[in-house]
C-alpha cells in the first residue's frame, strides 16, 4: 500500500505523541521534499522534525511533475501541492492531507 502524507498529519500526531499510529496503520509513509523541508525548517521548529529525519518508515521522495505542482500552488502551499503530485505520480492508495 502506498501512502503519501502532507505536513499536518505528521505534525499533529507527533505533537500528541501518536505518530506511531501512522506506522501501525500503514507501515511506510512517503512525503515529498517540500513536506520534509516544512517539518525540518530550523527557523520554524515543529513537532515531528526529529522523526522525519530518523524514522526509516517515513521516506522522502522527489516529485517529477513540476507543472502540476506549479498549477496547484495557486490554491495550496508547496507541501500540499507536492503531496498531491506525489500521490498521483506514485498512484498512492491514500493521501493524508487536511484540505477539502
Give short role names for the model-derived ranges.
Residues 1-94, 100:
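Active-site-proximal, substrate-binding regions of enzyme catalytic domains
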Amino acid at each position: 500500500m502506498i501512502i503519501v502524507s502532507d505536513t499536518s498529519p505528521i505534525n499533529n500526531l507527533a505533537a500528541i505523541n501518536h505518530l506511531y499510529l501512522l506506522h501501525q496503520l500503514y507501515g511506510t509513509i512517503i512525503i515529498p521534499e517540500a513536506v520534509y523541508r516544512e517539518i525540518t525548517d530550523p527557523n520554524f521548529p515543529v513537532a515531528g522534525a526529529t522523526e522525519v529525519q530518523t524514522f526509516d518508515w517515513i521516506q522522502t521522495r522527489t516529485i517529477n511533475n513540476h507543472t502540476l505542482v506549479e498549477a496547484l500552488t495557486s490554491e495550496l502551499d508547496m507541501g500540499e501541492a507536492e503531496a498531491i503530485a506525489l500521490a498521483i505520480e506514485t498512484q498512492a492508495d491514500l493521501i493524508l492531507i487536511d484540505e477539502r
